[in-house]
């Protein structure tokens, strides 16, 4: 099953116990998947979804939480439609539901972003908002260079509100416009896993992480297999050895590390087989390989000095024979 379908299937079956979270999820789903229409002088709400289980979930919550009936139409694939779509329509009580969910403000005007009670609420409501947005218009690509969790938004105001909801979950998301369409995107692998966990898609998160790890292992194996030059092999071993020393240095120094040295050390740990030049390019802002090497040397020097003062093993204590055989 594709990752997008797997996440949506799991979220569509996730039980949500609090009424506030269910209300927020419905509000955001209607905002992202639907629209307000005037039919014979009455407001009608429609939401177009790509899964029968999502449509059933939304229909059930509208009835249980807001007390309104709805109609479900199935639009079969054909012509320009590549997949079957499910259209949920609330006609009889459309205006009442629009006001209850915050699609209309107190004066009966359409809300361009998300309702204020969602924008300024708790982390639990932020999770519900993201869950509703993903169920409505979300996608998740396979792990790789272009991996992304993305939500297509109905406008820039809604996109910025979703970015704010991610910030309340301590996650960094970016709003961007591509060919006139507003989107919110997460590209960092750890952030994607964290968001899937917060939303309740635990099985999908484990599958995504497994595929991500498999790809990283395969990429590392391919990289090593292509090391035709012995100097590159020695450089890789030296980088791994430096990573082991840096790990010991961070243990020794604890919190007593200047920020610029800590950044260099973390880069070395996160990219253990990267060259110094590659590490410099990964730094923010980028720096030369000599600058990154100098910072790592100073970090190791500080740690070894402290180890001598304390009479304990220094940064070279974690090196193995394979690492030293350069």
UniProtKB/Swiss-Prot annotation:
Keywords: Cell cycle, Cell division, DNA-binding
GO molecular function: DNA binding
Disulfide cysteine pairs (residue numbers): none
Ranges annotated as DNA-binding: 275-308
Single biological process term from Gene Ontology: cell division
Pfam families in UniProt: HTH_WhiA, LAGLIDADG_WhiA, WhiA_N
Segments forming a coiled coil: none
NCBIfam families: DNA_bind_WhiA (TIGR00647)
Protein family: Belongs to the WhiA family.
Function summary: Involved in cell division and chromosome segregation.
Name of the molecule in the record: Probable cell division protein WhiA
UniProt source species: Kineococcus radiotolerans (strain ATCC BAA-149 / DSM 14245 / SRS30216)
Classification of source organism: Bacteria, Bacillati, Actinomycetota, Actinomycetes, Kineosporiales
The encoding gene: whiA
């Amino acid at each position: 099953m594709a990752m997008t379908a797997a996440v949506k299937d799991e979220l569509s079956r996730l039980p949500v116990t609090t009424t506030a979270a269910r209300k927020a999820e419905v509000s955001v789903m209607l905002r992202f998947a639907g629209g307000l229409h005037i039919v014979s002088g009455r407001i009608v709400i429609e939401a177009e979804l790509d899964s029968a289980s999502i449509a059933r979930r939304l229909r059930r919550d509208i009835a249980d939480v807001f007390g309104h009936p709805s109609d479900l139409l199935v639009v079969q694939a054909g012509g320009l439609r590549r997949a079957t779509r499910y259209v949920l329509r609330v006609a009889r009580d459309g205006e009442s539901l629009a006001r209850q969910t915050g699609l209309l403000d107190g004066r009966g005007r359409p809300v361009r972003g998300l309702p204020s009670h969602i924008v300024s609420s708790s982390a639990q409501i932020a999770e519900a908002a993201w869950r509703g947005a993903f169920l409505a218009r979300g996608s998740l690509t396979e792990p790789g260079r272009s991996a992304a969790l993305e939500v297509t938004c109905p406008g820039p105001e809604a996109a910025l509100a979703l970015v704010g909801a991610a910030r309340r979950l301590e996650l960094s998301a970016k709003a961007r416009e591509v060919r006139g369409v507003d989107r919110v995107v997460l590209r960092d692998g750890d952030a994607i896993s964290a968001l899937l966990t917060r939303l309740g898609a635990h099985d999908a998160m484990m599958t995504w992480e497994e595929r991500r790890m498999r790809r990283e292992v395969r990429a590392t194996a391919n990289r090593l297999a292509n090391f035709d030059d012995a100097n590159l092999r020695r450089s890789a071993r030296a980088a791994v050895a430096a990573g082991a020393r840096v790990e010991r240095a961070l243990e020794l120094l604890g919190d007593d590390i200047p920020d610029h040295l800590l950044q260099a050390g973390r880069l070395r740990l996160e990219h253990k087989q990267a060259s110094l030049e590659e590490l410099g390019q990964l730094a923010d802002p980028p720096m030369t390989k000599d600058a990154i090497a100098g910072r790592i040397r100073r970090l190791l020097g500080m740690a070894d000095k402290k180890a001598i003062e304390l009479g304990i093993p220094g940064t070279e204590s974690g090196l193995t024979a394979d690492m030293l055989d350069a």
